[in-house]
Structures are given as structure tokens and as C-alpha cells.
Amino acid sequence: MDAILSGKSGKMMTQAVEKKGVKIIGWTENGFRELTTSKGPITKPEDLRGLKIRVVGSPIFIETFRALGANPVNMNWSEATTGFQQGVVDGQENPTNGINIPLKIWDYHKFHCDWHYIIDPLMLGVNPRVWKSFSPEDQKLLLECAAETEKYGKALSRLGMDDGSALAYLKSIGKLPETTDCYAVMEANGMTVSRLSNEQIAALAKATEGVRKDWTAKIGADLVKAGE
């Protein structure tokens, strides 16, 4: 993710958004969107067949789960927990540290799958006219704050999943959250955690290859190639 945002593709995305009238002053992230279910562990495409999965209403999410044989359900997040309780849906996908841990997803689902199928980048944007109204000194201060926000947001989303850098950084600024090991917390609350191998992830990617091709054409092959 860092390589993409600091490289050619990140610059291309920033330019594309700024052409639409938004000044980008930074990037952070909400983490990989992982899968939780009530029906059983997910380790291969076949495990998703027939499952009703609550997804964001974006077409790329819906098409991805359909390609895997699941039944994606576009449901507002405000209705999701009720849907879990009533069995309207069998699972959902969301960032672990940002959503699943605070929600205590183990109250609804007992199976977690780390498959890294998509990551949530977050743009820090401002109205260009408002930005130009600030003094150079204030702009500099805001850019410094944005840079700190980038580091803080990334550390929160990666905590317990990286090489320990996130933990060290959050300790250094005195901002450690209550949960520092998401996997241990999920397992302690009765969840089965499946951390997929590269081979297992490749099988899921192969099953959604058609979706990738379609969206490469829509997004732009040059941008996708730059990101690769």
C-alpha cells in the first residue's frame, strides 16, 4: 500500500481526484477488508457458495462476491447487526481493527478469514477555494497535521498485523488502543481465525479474475499497471 501511494499510481489517483475539484493533502487507510461468517471457515472459493454476505453497495463488491458464488446483500450498516442476529445474512466484510474489533463481531460470527481481498485507502481532502484562503503558515501546519494523521491511521489499521512497527509508533505517541493483538482477542472470544496462505489467496483471486479484467478496463489499464 505504501509503495502504491508513494509511487506513480498514487500520483495518478491524486491527479484524477484533484481534476474533480478536491485538493488532496494526504492519504491514510482503514485496513484490509476481511471476511467474517456464522456458517463456517472460509479457506477456498467453494466455501462461499450460497452464503448471504452483507456488502457495501458498490458494484465492484457485489460483482466480486457473485463471482465467488455468494449472494451479496446490499444492506445499510445501521441494519447490519440486526441482520446478523436474524440470520438475514451469513457474513460480512470489513476492516478488522477499524470495524470488527470495536463492533465485537464475535457476538454475531464465529469465523474470521484473513484474505486481504481489498484495502480501504482514505484520502484527506479539502475544498481548493478554502485551501487557498489559508495563509502559507496555516497550510504548512495543516500539511504537518495531515502527515501525522497518515501515520496514526495506518498504525491503527495495521496494529497486530505488521512487524511491530505500528505498536512501537503508537506507544511512542501515547496512543495505544485497548486491543493491540486483534487475532488473540478474536480467538479468546471463541472465533476461529483462518489466515490464508498465498496459494489459498491465489485460488480466490483466480475465481474473481473476470471481475478484475472488467474493472481494469473501467478504471484504466495504465493506472492498474502502474499500481502493479
Model-flagged regions — what are they?
Residues M1, K11-E228:
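N-terminal secretory/targeting leader peptides
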Residues L5-S9:
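Core domains of carbohydrate- and sulfate-ester-processing enzymes
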